[in-house]
């Protein structure tokens, strides 16, 4: 099991990205969350089987057709009890 945290920069708020990533996170049976940050970026924390977390990373990089990534920061993150993949407000 692995846990990753990504901070997404660019046109990432107000374009349906959180909902898009939640749907994929649930389908991949991941735990974690996605949320908007005050600086206009989006934070994603995903925990699960390594292959499934890497698949979510691929989905993040592809975007939803409305988002436009300018930068992505990635780091290992502590394993936690995040529950099902959800949107945090």
Swiss-Prot record:
Highest rank taxon of the organism: Bacteria
EC number: 3.6.1.7
Keyword Transcription regulation part of the UniProt annotation: no
Pfam family, one: Acylphosphatase
Catalytic activity: an acyl phosphate + H2O = a carboxylate + phosphate + H(+)
InterPro entries: Acylphosphatase, Acylphosphatase-like_dom, Acylphosphatase-like_dom_sf, Acylphosphatase_CS
Keywords: Hydrolase
Matching SUPFAM superfamilies: Acylphosphatase/BLUF domain-like
Domain Acylphosphatase-like span(s) in chain numbering: 3-89
Residues forming the catalytic site: 18, 36
PROSITE patterns noted in UniProt: ACYLPHOSPHATASE_2, ACYLPHOSPHATASE_3
GO molecular function, one term: acylphosphatase activity
Chain ranges passing through the membrane: none
Enzyme class, first EC level, given as a word: hydrolase
Family assignment from sequence similarity: Belongs to the acylphosphatase family.
Protein name per its UniProtKB record: Acylphosphatase
Gene: acyP
